[in-house]
From Swiss-Prot:
Gene Ontology molecular function: ATP-dependent peptidase activity; ATPase binding; serine-type endopeptidase activity
CDD domains per record: S14_ClpP_2
HAMAP family, A to Z: ClpP
Protein name (database record): ATP-dependent Clp protease proteolytic subunit 2
Chain's gene name: clpP2
Keyword Oxidoreductase: no
Isomerase keyword on record: no
Catalytic activity of the protein: Hydrolysis of proteins to small peptides in the presence of ATP and magnesium. alpha-casein is the usual test substrate. In the absence of ATP, only oligopeptides shorter than five residues are hydrolyzed (such as succinyl-Leu-Tyr-|-NHMec, and Leu-Tyr-Leu-|-Tyr-Trp, in which cleavage of the -Tyr-|-Leu- and -Tyr-|-Trp bonds also occurs)
Family designation: Belongs to the peptidase S14 family.
Record function comment: Cleaves peptides in various proteins in a process that requires ATP hydrolysis. Has a chymotrypsin-like activity. Plays a major role in the degradation of misfolded proteins.
Pfam families listed in its UniProt record: CLP_protease
Active site: 132, 157
GO CC annotation: cytoplasm; endopeptidase Clp complex
Entry EC number(s): 3.4.21.92
Length: 240
């Protein structure tokens, strides 16, 4: 039995409060790339300065991001990170943050299968949007550790696809889409506890949910709220 709300995961709280005693307070710079601005964290240590892109820095805290559509390149990157973190510590949880409109079913299933196979629990956290394959991966997190931020949106639907060519080619592609539809619906029923018949009806069209609705549906277990902040006598913010 889980409460409707929970504070942010421990790694996020540690980063927010600056509690990593191994490093001095990092300086943050931004580097403009062709697609987006990727911040670089410059950390001071006894051995001098070291620079990390923000995602590599968060990977050290066992935090992985899925912040784009799902394709083979994205799947390869996330699978590699999950396997690396398992090799580093097979008992410590991994956090997978999801803000994704979905994408390739086969690429998404590669991520999903790896999530189920690695030894550590993979906690999933939705921020922004988890739609289509993004919502499926959100539901595939470790039981009790599937979460969403309060303003997130979650959407499930059936696989989409198209085909052209001779009639037999179209028939082959149609069978493949129906196979993926059946597989995804079966797994969604397993992860949510909903009857398969309800999953089939709800995924027939785009089915949007708020975090609270997704929790009631069984897609997630907790809705995250902002940690309570207290101000110390020295005006330093600390987490309660």
């Amino acid at each position: 039995m889980f409460s409707s709300h929970a504070s942010l995961p421990i790694h996020s709280r540690r980063l927010a409060a600056g509690l990593d005693s191994r490093w001095q307070q990092p300086q943050i710079q931004a580097i403009a790339g062709s697609q987006a601005i990727v911040p670089t964290v410059v950390e001071q240590s006894g051995r001098g300065e070291r620079a990390f892109d923000i995602y590599s820095r968060l990977l050290r805290e066992r935090i992985v991001f899925l912040g784009t559509g799902v394709d083979d390149a994205v799947a390869d990157s996330i699978v590699a990170q999950l396997l690396f973190l398992e090799a580093e510590d097979p008992e410590k949880d991994i956090q997978l943050y999801i803000n994704s409109p979905g994408g390739s079913v086969t690429a998404g299933m590669a991520i999903y299968d790896t999530m189920q196979q690695v030894a550590p629990d993979v906690a999933t956290i939705c921020f922004g949007l988890a739609a289509s394959m993004g919502a499926f991966l959100l539901s595939g997190g470790a039981q009790g550790k599937r979460m969403a931020l309060p303003s997130a949106r979650i959407m499930i639907h059936q696989p989409l696809g198209g085909a052209q060519g001779q009639a037999v080619d179209i028939e082959i592609q149609a069978r493949e889409i129906l196979y993926h539809k059946s597989t995804l619906n079966d797994l969604l029923a397993q992860h949510t506890g909903q009857p398969l018949e309800k999953i089939e009806v709800d995924t027939d069209r785009d089915f949007f949910m708020s975090p609270e609705e997704a929790k009631a549906y069984g897609l997630i277990d907790q809705v995250l709220t902002r940690p309570t902040m207290a101000i110390t006598d020295h005006n330093d913010a600390v987490l309660q």
